[in-house]
């Protein structure tokens, strides 16, 4: 089982200025965690620390109980801007992380096509990014993040610029990927309903620390679509109230 841990982690940009303060956090295989908070609360910096993209000023980042000294190799990233290479076809954009490391094989191409099919965009494999919609570009970015078969997927505001219907479709697809492939996922988002729908655990950050953490309700007891239930609406309300408390702190 994969395990990623932040142990008493702090990060200091300048003297006496901490963007992350003494954070303890743990993510395991198959879990989805979402971090919420105002801009500048430390969410993205903490994600970079967890991924090994930054070194903590104090504390430890542990992957499989081993200190992280460099960027993690078994991790995929999805950002708000898909940053697809406009002169490369969809299939080539997806295969790019492999191409940067070694020669592409027929097995790699077959897996890329399988990801396209899973994300319902198999008909786009030979198209160029300029011909794609925002939702299609996001699906390509997800496939590219998964092509190396990572155990971790980190997403920083991946669907912020998309319309509600497309956003919910992609959330459904990521939830399916999480459950079918047992991938651990971390989301940084401002969208309360997105966090409530996806996350096993939600954390609200303020001034570089978690001021609220909450385990998700037991959705297995919900017979209908979870977004349509009173339990989901009440859960979103609870999270929003915690965010409002940070605004007045």
Predicted regions and their residues:
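Conserved ABC transporter NBD signature motif
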Residues: 59-71
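Catalytic Walker B motif of ABC-type/P-loop ATPase nucleotide-binding domains
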Residues: 153-156
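Helix-to-loop junction immediately C-terminal to a conserved catalytic motif
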Residues: 51
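Conserved ABC ATPase signature
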Residues: 128-132, 136
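A short, proline-enriched helix->beta-strand linker immediately N-terminal to the Walker B motif
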Residues: 147-151
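The feature captures the beta-strand-to-loop junction immediately N-terminal to the Walker
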Residues: 36-38
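Conserved ABC ATPase "signature" region
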Residues: 106-124, 176
């Amino acid at each position: 089982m994969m395990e990623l841990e932040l142990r008493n982690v702090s990060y200091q940009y300048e003297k006496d200025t901490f963007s992350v303060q003494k954070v303890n956090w743990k993510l395991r295989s198959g879990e989805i965690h979402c971090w919420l908070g105002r801009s500048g609360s430390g969410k993205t910096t903490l994600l970079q620390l967890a991924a090994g993209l930054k070194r903590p000023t104090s504390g430890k980042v542990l992957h499989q109980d081993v200190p992280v000294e460099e960027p993690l190799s078994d991790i995929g990233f999805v950002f708000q801007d898909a940053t697809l290479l406009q002169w490369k076809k969809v299939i080539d954009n997806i295969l790019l992380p492999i191409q940067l490391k070694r020669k592409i094989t027929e097995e790699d191409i077959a897996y890329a096509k399988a990801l396209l099919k899973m994300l319902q965009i198999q008909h786009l494999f030979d198209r160029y990014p300029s011909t794609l919609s925002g939702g299609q570009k996001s699906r390509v970015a997800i496939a590219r993040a998964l092509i190396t078969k990572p155990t971790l997927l980190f997403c920083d505001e991946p669907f912020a610029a998309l319309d509600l219907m497309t956003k919910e479709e992609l959330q459904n697809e990521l939830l399916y990927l999480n459950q079918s492939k047992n991938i651990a996922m971390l989301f940084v988002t401002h969208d309360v309903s997105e966090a409530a729908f996806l996350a096993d655990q939600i954390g609200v950050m303020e001034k570089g620390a978690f001021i609220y953490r909450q385990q998700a309700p037991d959705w297995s007891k919900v017979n209908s679509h979870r977004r349509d239930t009173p339990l989901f609406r009440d859960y979103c309300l609870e999270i929003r109230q915690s965010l409002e408390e940070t605004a007045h702190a």
